[in-house]
Design a protein with these regions (language model features):
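Sigma70-family region 2
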Residues: 11-12, 35-38, 51-66, 85-87
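N-terminal module of bacterial RNA polymerase sigma factors
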Residues: 1-28, 113, 121, 138, ...
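Structural recognition of an alpha-helix C-terminal capping motif at a helix-to-coil junction
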Residues: 45-52, 65-77
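C-terminal edge and immediately downstream basic/flexible tail or linker adjoining helix-turn-helix-like DNA-binding
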Residues: 91-98, 106, 110, 132-135, ...
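Amphipathic, Lys/Arg- and hydrophobic-enriched alpha-helical face
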Residues: 22-40, 57, 137, 182, ...
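Short, charged helix-capping/linker segments at alpha-helix termini
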Residues: 11-20, 30-49, 169
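Helix-turn-helix DNA-binding module
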Residues: 41, 131-171, 185
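Arg/Lys-rich amphipathic alpha helix in sigma70-family domain 2
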Residues: 59-63, 73-94, 126, 178, ...
Length: 204
């Protein structure tokens, strides 16, 4: 069943159809929330909040873009807002803010490394790369992190990213260019976009 058909069913009162939409996309939405906010537990809460908010607003959803794009817009906006608010709460001084960011990045990298150890399909080199990317993502600014997650990990095209972030297409391209440079400098100049995509979901 196509997403549009499920959306129409929900609008007609068949709320169980929304459960199918959640099952289809909750893992990828969670992954994006986690990459952006940097906290596993917060990402779970943000994922639930995103699907709840989308459900409550479904009556106003015009379907000019797909549900998949729309739910990501909701989730990314919530994650970025959460991160900004979290940083404001934590930042007592510039030094304290920098320390908090570093701690958050290290924690995300550790969690990713632990998960990689449990994955028999991922070798030690790839596991370390996976963890390095996770940590480096948290050291990027919010705009750069979001566009890297959406393009190089989740695989959205430029037009979809423009709709999700609600920015011009040209801004997506220039922001992604700068974000990739920043990420490569934070990890290793040899890292490629294909490696980032594999880290995201294991497929091209």
């Amino acid at each position: 069943v196509e997403d549009d058909a499920l959306v129409e069913r929900v609008k007609q009162g068949q709320t169980e159809a929304y459960g199918e939409l959640v099952r289809r996309y909750q893992d990828r939405v969670f992954n994006a929330c986690w990459r952006i906010c940097g906290h596993l537990e917060d990402a779970r809460d943000l994922t639930q909040e995103a699907f709840l908010k989308a459900f409550e607003g479904l009556g106003n959803f015009r379907q000019q873009s797909g549900f998949y794009t729309w739910i990501f817009r909701v989730a990314v906006n919530l994650s970025l807002s959460h991160r900004r608010n979290d940083h404001r709460r934590r930042r007592v001084s510039l030094d304290a803010g920098a320390a908090a960011t570093g701690t958050q990045a290290d924690e995300l990298a550790r969690r990713v490394r632990d998960e990689s150890d449990d994955d028999p399909t991922r070798g030690p080199v790839e596991a370390e790369l996976h963890a390095a990317v996770a940590g480096a993502l948290q050291r990027l600014d919010d705009d750069h992190r979001a566009v890297i997650v959406l393009r190089d990990i989740e695989g959205f095209d430029y037009q979809e990213i423009a709709r999700i972030l609600q920015i011009p297409l040209g801004t997506v391209k220039s922001r992604l260019f700068r974000a990739r440079i920043a990420l490569q400098q934070a990890i290793d100049p040899a890292i490629t976009r294909e490696e980032l995509k594999r880290i995201g979901d294991g497929e091209d």
